[in-house]
Design a protein with these regions (language model features):
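N-terminal phosphate/diphosphate-binding loop that engages ATP/GTP or pyrophosphate donors
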Residues: 27-92
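Walker A/P-loop
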Residues: 18
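ATP-dependent NMP and nucleoside kinases share a basic, alpha-helical "lid"
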Residues: 88-165
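ATP-binding Walker
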Residues: 15
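P-loop (Walker A) phosphate-binding loop of NTP-binding proteins
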Residues: 12
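Hydrophobic anchor at the beta1->P-loop junction of P-loop NTPases
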Residues: 9
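Small-molecule kinase domains that catalyze NTP-dependent phosphoryl transfer to phosphate-bearing small molecules
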Residues: 71-72, 117-124, 131, 135-136, ...
Length: 227
């Protein structure tokens, strides 16, 4: 039996991390975990509960009532759950997107989510994407990929995604939201997004999904051969 590895995919929002992670997991027969969805689920709970996400004490207090997990839908696709209920659709709206970085930077929130993420990946065979997967969650991951793309490309991708779902947003709103999230993700005190020397960098501004997948699979095969 081929040995399994953990694959960490980090990068800014709307860089295609989830798309690549899902494709790799499906091809390898690994478990895909969208760590960002976990923080979005926590954020959704705060919004539903009328908790001020800028009030750290209030968020920490409400965190005791949050249980985040995953379940497979009818298509055997992993969906994030909030207190036992799938919220895969609800967590993708612009309101959650505009607040998630504020919630995710809180130490108690990250501690709770990281512990869950590490438990999921303890037996290897996991592809997880996020901001701190290779630096904090799986610092010993056999393969770490850092994904990036130009701000213009990222904004266009996000605009297309939200428009397809019927959300009424402007490209300018999305660009500002991405810029705001980038600043918080890179500058927060707890687990900031960071490119370290052990990452493979994948700039997909001008790459097709097929080209990205082929490049990443090459790195996967190299990593497996090294264990």
């Amino acid at each position: 039996m081929q040995k399994k590895i953990n694959i960490a995919i980090d990068g800014y929002s709307s860089c295609g991390k989830g798309t690549l992670a899902k494709a790799l997991a499906k091809s390898l027969g690994y478990v895909f975990i969208d760590s960002g969805a976990m923080y979005r689920a926590v954020t959704l709970h705060m919004l539903q509960s009328k908790v001020d996400v800028n009030d750290e004490a209030a968020v920490v207090s409400a965190l005791a009532n949050v249980q985040v997990g995953f379940e497979n839908n009818a298509k055997q696709q992993s969906e994030v759950t909030l207190n036992g209920v799938s919220v895969e659709s609800e967590i993708r709206n612009i309101e959650v997107a505009s607040k998630v970085s504020e919630v995710a930077k809180i130490a108690a929130v990250r501690t709770k989510m990281v512990a869950l993420q590490q438990a999921i990946g303890s037996n290897r065979g996991v592809v997880m994407d996020g901001r701190d997967i290779g630096t904090v969650v799986f610092p010993d991951a056999e393969l770490k990929i850092f994904m990036t793309a130009s701000p213009e490309v990222r904004a266009q991708r996000r605009f297309a995604e939200l428009s397809a779902k019927g959300d009424v947003v402007t490209l300018e709103e999305i660009a500002k939201n991405l810029e705001h999230r980038d600043t918080i993700d890179a500058s927060r005190e707890n687990s900031p997004l960071m490119l370290t020397g052990d990452y493979r960098v994948l700039d997909n501004s001008d790459l097709s999904k097929e080209a990205q997948f082929a490049m990443a699979m090459g790195w996967v095969n190299e990593a497996i051969q090294c264990i």
